[in-house]
Regions:
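Flexible, glycine/charged-enriched surface loops at secondary-structure junctions
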Residues: 90-91
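Short glycine/serine-rich loop segments
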Residues: 1-84
Length: 91
């Protein structure tokens, strides 16, 4: 429906996950870029706490942004968090 938007800077990614084009996507959120698209497209959006998922080397992130994911199920979100999370002394 071209009259609607998937919202946020991760809107294209959330549209792809919602349409079944990809099983999940990673994203960053500093002002709703995970949460808004998840709400608009019926996905599970995780905006992890700062430091939960390392951000070292991700130079495009704003200082207040954190990494997270968009998936279709809570189980997929938990699996992805297990893969992505962990301490990084460079953060």
């Amino acid at each position: 429906d071209p009259s609607r938007t998937p919202g946020g800077s991760s809107g294209g990614s959330s549209a792809a996950v919602s349409a079944g084009m990809v099983p999940f996507c990673t994203a960053s959120d500093g002002g709703g870029s995970i949460r808004t698209p998840a709400a608009f497209t019926g996905l599970v959006g995780l905006r992890a706490s700062y430091g939960r998922i390392p951000t070292f080397g991700d130079t495009h992130l704003a200082q207040n942004a954190v990494v997270g994911s968009l998936t279709t199920t809570v189980a997929d979100t938990a699996l992805l968090l297990d893969v992505m999370a962990g301490p990084d002394p460079r953060d």
